[in-house]
């Protein structure tokens, strides 16, 4: 893994994986896509889609743990605060050899700079929410979200995915 390459690729993901419009039907389709992918692969995780103050999709799959919803909340809070993916935030902080508490005063109990939460962006509007997965290693959480977004938006996942 090369942090600079990953950060460039995540910036491209965040630029290209944006919606023309996003409503509750779109949230359901995105959540169902993630649920199908995770179920087919037998991934024990929690899936959450929240539009700021309203949770609009939630699923927990076999193998998820009681800690996963808290990880979802903390990663989602990071996206809501910084308007970029929690994985990009974590990699940026790793590169700077710091953390959210030291750099921004954000407590670990409320924020997590670990992969798995991705901003839901509507073109011309900005970040309106976050889609979050927790339960896998952080890079896999992030990759699953990106794959589902790419499928739903008709984007070329192979051109967007992080290198192995």
From Swiss-Prot:
Coiled-coil ranges (or none): none
Signal peptide location: none
Domain of life according to the entry: Bacteria
Cysteines paired by S-S bonds: none
InterPro entries reported for this sequence: PduO/GlcC-like, PduO/GlcC-like_sf, YBR137W-like
Family, per entry: Belongs to the UPF0303 family.
Protein name, entry field: UPF0303 protein R02983
Organism: Rhizobium meliloti (strain 1021) (Ensifer meliloti)
């Amino acid at each position: 893994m090369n942090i600079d390459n990953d950060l460039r690729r995540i910036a491209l993901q965040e630029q290209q994986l944006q919606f023309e419009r996003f409503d509750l039907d779109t949230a359901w389709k995105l959540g169902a896509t993630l649920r199908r992918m995770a179920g087919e692969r037998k991934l024990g995780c929690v899936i959450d889609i929240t539009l700021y103050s309203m949770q609009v999709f939630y699923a927990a799959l076999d193998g998820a743990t009681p800690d996963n919803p808290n990880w979802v909340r903390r990663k989602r809070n990071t996206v809501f605060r910084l308007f970029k993916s929690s994985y990009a935030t974590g990699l940026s902080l790793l590169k700077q050899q710091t953390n959210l508490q030291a750099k921004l005063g954000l407590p670990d109990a409320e924020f997590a700079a670990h992969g798995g939460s991705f901003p839901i962006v509507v073109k011309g509007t900005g970040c309106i929410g976050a889609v979050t997965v927790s339960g896998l290693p952080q890079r896999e959480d992030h990759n699953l979200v990106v794959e589902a977004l790419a499928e739903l938006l008709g984007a070329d996942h192979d051109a967007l995915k992080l290198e192995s």
